[in-house]
């Protein structure tokens, strides 16, 4: 059994500030950190650290080297990662002295997935393998249908949540990764037990 993560690859630019910048304000940053992230990258790295054989599929720009080197250091197989003529997705993160943050996301290459690229990746996987998805790339509905047709088990983290997710063929999902916020958005319930009960009612096969 192989694990395939099809997802976002981001560079996180983290600025340490006295306070979150206000409209029209210019302030100096005390520190800048750059890290590899994106839900796809993070999930692949976590699986690899847990000892799984995991493949990562995603799109990056010409500044790909740090991303690939870091993923490979975790033990992630990056053979399916491809370069595109755009900037790698990134996040600008402001963190104030109290730990509060503000985040601006740029999708970049994460929004350049095509049906041809999806096919080229899924052709290397088969029934019994596991696909892990999030909602930071485009074309998720197409990926769901094609993976399901191949007999691949599908795990979905519906984050960031959008109402359109509820129109996807979610009965094809084998397992949901959700937190309390996403669960509430999926079910319109607020209490954890009610969220779980409603998820089981809506998706009894997951």
Give residue spans per PLM region.
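Short acidic active-site motifs
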Residues: 117-120, 139-143, 163-166, 194-195
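Conserved phosphate/ATP/ADP-binding segment of small-molecule kinases
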Residues: 149-155, 159-206
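Substrate-binding N-lobe of the ribokinase-like
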Residues: 3, 23-90
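Conserved phosphate-binding/catalytic loop of the ribokinase/pfkB sugar-kinase fold
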Residues: 56, 81-83, 93-130
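Surface-exposed amphipathic alpha-helices with a cationic face
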Residues: 48, 141-151, 200
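Positively charged, low-complexity intrinsically disordered leader regions
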Residues: 1-23
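Short gly/ser/thr-rich secondary-structure transition/capping motifs
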Residues: 75, 111-116, 155-161
């Amino acid at each position: 059994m192989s694990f395939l993560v099809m997802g976002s690859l981001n560079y996180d630019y983290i600025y340490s500030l006295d306070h979150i910048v206000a409209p029209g304000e210019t302030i100096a940053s005390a520190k800048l950190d750059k890290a590899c992230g994106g839900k796809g990258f993070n999930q692949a790295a976590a699986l690899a650290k847990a000892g799984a054989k995991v493949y990562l599929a995603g799109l990056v720009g010409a500044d790909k080297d740090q991303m690939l080197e870091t993923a490979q250091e975790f033990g992630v197989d990056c053979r399916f990662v491809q370069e595109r003529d755009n900037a790698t997705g990134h996040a600008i993160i402001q963190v104030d002295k109290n730990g509060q943050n503000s985040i601006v996301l740029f999708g970049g290459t994460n929004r350049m997935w095509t049906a041809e690229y999806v096919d080229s990746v899924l052709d290397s996987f088969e029934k019994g393998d596991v696909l892990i998805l999030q909602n930071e790339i485009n074309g998720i509905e197409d990926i769901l249908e094609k993976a399901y047709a191949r007999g691949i088990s599908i795990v979905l983290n519906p984050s960031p949540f959008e109402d359109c997710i509820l129109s996807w063929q979610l009965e094809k999902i084998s397992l949901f990764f959700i937190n309390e916020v996403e669960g509430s958005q999926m079910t319109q319930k607020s209490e954890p037990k009610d969220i779980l009960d409603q998820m089981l009612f809506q998706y009894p096969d997951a």
